[in-house]
Amino acid sequence: MFEIHPVKKVSVVIPVYNEQESLPELIRRTTTACESLGKEYEILLIDDGSSDNSAHMLVEASQAENSHIVSILLNRNYGQHSAIMAGFSHVTGDLIITLDADLQNPPEEIPRLVAKADEGYDVVGTVRQNRQDSWFRKTASKMINRLIQRTTGKAMGDYGCMLRAYRRHIVDAMLHCHERSTFIPILANIFARRAIEIPVHHSEREFGESKYSFMRLINLMYDLVTCLTTTPLRMLSLLGSIIAIGGFSIAVLLVILRLTFGPQWAAEGVFMLFAVLFTFIGAQFIGMGLLGEYIGRIYTDVRARPRYFVQQVIRPSSKENE
């Protein structure tokens, strides 16, 4: 049997990108939620290359009296999951909770995640109830969740919700993975022995706009497909086999028709031949594009460049920067 250790210290990791309007309320509510735990805690805010005043506000929050805030400033924008991984590399708690800065998932849910983790779960996920997002966002999220469930076989309901809790050994395992394209909820479930999801409240976004545009969602789907599974490559092999068999069958059919109806039929079949040819060419280009995606990601990983570059770390115990 695996021994269940009680949670002694909680680390809350929050990526921040152009969220200066929501930061004061975010810090206040997250601090209040952590204070109610009766445990040691720290709040790590990672500025992901914001162009507004977010970074300056984080530094001030870390340097405030009796602060529990660690500010991590990245030199540019690397994306939500890379920013979270930067936070993971600086946590000191034995339970790590991730939270978005837009306050759509309320920080007041943190005690529930901690309580569930204390029951012995490695990963505590959440499912958003009554989502307050646009039709497009909800539809895209459903498609992504179904894609993940089919490719991984993990029947989790809401991979897009970043309000999650991870035991320290799960975070350490993720930090040992060096692929550039990382989707944290899936990666964590690969290493988790026991995982569970709980329902949480979902609010409308009060400040700013969502940072996930249409193209970023498309890129996310490409990342998920090429990072999670090689099934598309196997499907290409299957498609190639079907096309080859179909082409051979059509060739045999053309020979039979020519022998049956004479050479004059061949001229009348030119347009069909062109249609078949264009179908094969289109299938080849689709396959080449998919192979290019895989090869491009292999090339990116082989270069072994860091996921992010930390420009500055400000801890509450000292006003000196790391």
UniProtKB/Swiss-Prot annotation:
Transmembrane residue ranges: 236-256, 270-290
GO terms (BP aspect): 4-amino-4-deoxy-alpha-L-arabinopyranosyl undecaprenyl phosphate biosynthetic process; lipid A biosynthetic process; lipopolysaccharide biosynthetic process; response to antibiotic
CDD domains hit by this protein: DPM1_like_bac (cd04187)
Entry EC no(s): 2.4.2.53
UniProt GO MF annotations: phosphotransferase activity, for other substituted phosphate groups; undecaprenyl-phosphate 4-deoxy-4-formamido-L-arabinose transferase activity
Keywords: Antibiotic resistance, Cell inner membrane, Cell membrane, Glycosyltransferase, Lipid A biosynthesis, Lipid biosynthesis, Lipid metabolism, Lipopolysaccharide biosynthesis, Membrane, Transferase, Transmembrane, Transmembrane helix
Enzyme kind, highest EC tier: transferase
Pfam family membership, one: Glycos_transf_2
Topological domain ranges for the Periplasmic compartment: 257-269
Reaction equations catalysed: UDP-4-deoxy-4-formamido-beta-L-arabinose + di-trans,octa-cis-undecaprenyl phosphate = 4-deoxy-4-formamido-alpha-L-arabinopyranosyl di-trans,octa-cis-undecaprenyl phosphate + UDP
GO (cellular component) term, any one: plasma membrane
Subcellular location field: Cell inner membrane
Claim: Thylakoid is one of the keywords in the record: no
Cytoplasmic side: 1-235, 291-322
Pathway: Glycolipid biosynthesis; 4-amino-4-deoxy-alpha-L-arabinose undecaprenyl phosphate biosynthesis; 4-amino-4-deoxy-alpha-L-arabinose undecaprenyl phosphate from UDP-4-deoxy-4-formamido-beta-L-arabinose and undecaprenyl phosphate: step 1/2; Bacterial outer membrane biogenesis; lipopolysaccharide biosynthesis
UniProt entry tagged with the keyword S-adenosyl-L-methionine: no
InterPro entries: ArnC_tfrase, Glyco_trans_2-like, Glycosyltransferase_2, Nucleotide-diphossugar_trans
Membrane topology, from the record: Multi-pass membrane protein
Function description: Catalyzes the transfer of 4-deoxy-4-formamido-L-arabinose from UDP to undecaprenyl phosphate. The modified arabinose is attached to lipid A and is required for resistance to polymyxin and cationic antimicrobial peptides.
NCBIfam families, per database record: PRK10714.1 (NF007986)
Family to which this protein belongs: Belongs to the glycosyltransferase 2 family.
PANTHER family: UNDECAPRENYL-PHOSPHATE 4-DEOXY-4-FORMAMIDO-L-ARABINOSE TRANSFERASE (PTHR48090:SF3), UNDECAPRENYL-PHOSPHATE 4-DEOXY-4-FORMAMIDO-L-ARABINOSE TRANSFERASE-RELATED (PTHR48090)
Name of the molecule in the record: Undecaprenyl-phosphate 4-deoxy-4-formamido-L-arabinose transferase
